UniProtKB/Swiss-Prot annotation:
Listed Gene3D superfamilies: 3.40.50.970, TPP-binding domain
GO CC field: acetolactate synthase complex
Temperature dependence comment: Optimum temperature is 30 degrees Celsius.
Location of this chain's protein in the cell: Cytoplasm
UniProt-recorded name of the protein: Sulfoacetaldehyde acetyltransferase
Organism for this UniProt entry: Castellaniella defragrans (Alcaligenes defragrans)
Catalytic activity from the UniProt record: acetyl phosphate + sulfite + H(+) = sulfoacetaldehyde + phosphate
Domain of life: Bacteria
Record note on quaternary structure: Homotetramer.
Annotated family: Belongs to the TPP enzyme family.
Chief site of localization: cytoplasm
TM region(s), chain numbering: none
GO biological process, one term: isoleucine biosynthetic process
Keywords: Acyltransferase, Cytoplasm, Magnesium, Metal-binding, Thiamine pyrophosphate, Transferase
Amino acid sequence: MANDTRQVVQGVQEMTPSEAFVETMVANGVTEIFGIMGSAFMDAMDIFAPAGIKLIPVVHEQGAAHMADGFARVSGRTGVVIGQNGPGISNCVTAIAAAYWAHTPVVIVTPEAGTTGIGLGGFQEARQLPMFQEFTKYQGHVTHPARMAEYTARCFARARDEMGPAQLNIPRDYFYGKIKCEIPLPQPLDRGPGGAQSLDAAARLLAEAKFPVIISGGGVVMGDAVEECKALAERLGAPVVNSYLHNDSFPASHPLWCGPLGYQGSKAAMKLLADADVVLALGTRLGPFGTLPQHGLDYWPKNARIIQVDADSKMLGLVKKITVGVCGDAKASAAEISRRIDGMKLACDANKAERAARIQAEKDAWEQELTDWTHERDPFSLDMIEEQSKEEGNWLHPRQVLRELEKAMPEDVMVSTDIGNINSVANSYLRFEKPRSFFAAMSWGNCGYAFPTIIGAKVAAPHRPAVSYAGDGAWGMSMSEIMTCVRHDIPVTAVVFHNRQWGAEKKNQVDFYNRRFVAGELESESFAGIARAMGAEGVVVDRIEDVGPALKKAIDAQMNDRKTTVIEIMCTRELGDPFRRDALSKPVRLLEKYRDYT
């Protein structure tokens, strides 16, 4: 391919709308698109390759949109997904919602029915804009072929600038014809650190703080602000906790790192945050689910003064009461706050050594607790352990499995986790040294997220090891994408926790419905065998001493032999805490025939 194929045409030119569409994507740095081929955009697809764009075909369009999400989160570029009008597009809705809640810049291109047939109920016709209106930052509908480049460019700009998905809706007949237009070039947005008044106020609060704590959120990752966060933390001697499911927002080897908040997060992080007199929430919206009580700790500091930094002003004070709100880029804001406190007399300097000792003590205690916490200790889990000791086969404790996986992870690894009980318990064990390493479905929490997302991440960073976690329930929704890995030489490693149940929801039946189990059991065939049938490697692990070596061998095969491996780990049916005790109540039955169901 000649290098000049990536050179965007300059000035007003005569071209087709398909050419305008493709040239605008080239101008925005697009090199990969995820999706399934379709007649609705075939004229444009025909010139993807000469433009230096690769269409990566998938098994299901939901997987394509998740791949675009993972690609964007690793690369820092805009992910792109495309599909056939109607059912191909509706298949993307769930994954675009996940990208929305992860603040991921993704452009979903939605070709639709031709203009002469709209409203007649034709083949694969649908009103596609309403499908995505809740989960996009911007929806562009091409109203005339001559405006193809304009709308395409605007969707990329909005996705990038507003940190979320944008929809580009194109009537399929608008790809054809002749137009005259100029290809718009992207204009990067300089967000800046925030207003001087709010930054001054933040610096004053931190100067007065005796026990400051920093919450490092997704904005630190997306804004490449880890070094600035680190410098500020070191100046303050402040413990740094990761916001929920942003475990890669601060290096785990740093002495001030204390682990994640949220479900199954770090007790050290929670105990230290509970004692804060000033909290700097850097690049986080302080989401409600990620700050719920956990481990019996209602840890949010009710009397602390809160400084919240977010690039989206709508997030400031939305969930938690704040003292100072800074609307700014996390990187620029952290650097500017550091500059302001440089040379100031800080109250926390007086107890820096004492606080450092406390931080280390809390971390040591939590690490020891995790080491000793080999299995769940609630009555149901103990019953399951006893029951399965009498069954054929060998079943491993999930917590021990997660600990062994943690120890075997390479430093440069990327990990995605699905929703579910074991996957969420993994929050205690996932530690990272660099940003853009950890991906989860965030507040959307959809099953089937992890595997396609890590495929997209691997496309963006083929030099990095890529590992996904899924339970056997969620795995059933996405395992068909093994064929995508094999067909298109995208090697990844998938860990499947085979405990034969929908664990997260079943835990609610344990705690609230007297162990009346409905639709929660999942007796499954061999996932390793299915993987082998699809052309990948498949390994069954049922001894704890084999967990780490199996992961290391699979990653070696991924990186050196370009092999995709599914590691099926046979786990007991023990279960961690329910996600939300506040979301359910003990049942009340008023009709006589249901009285026993309490």
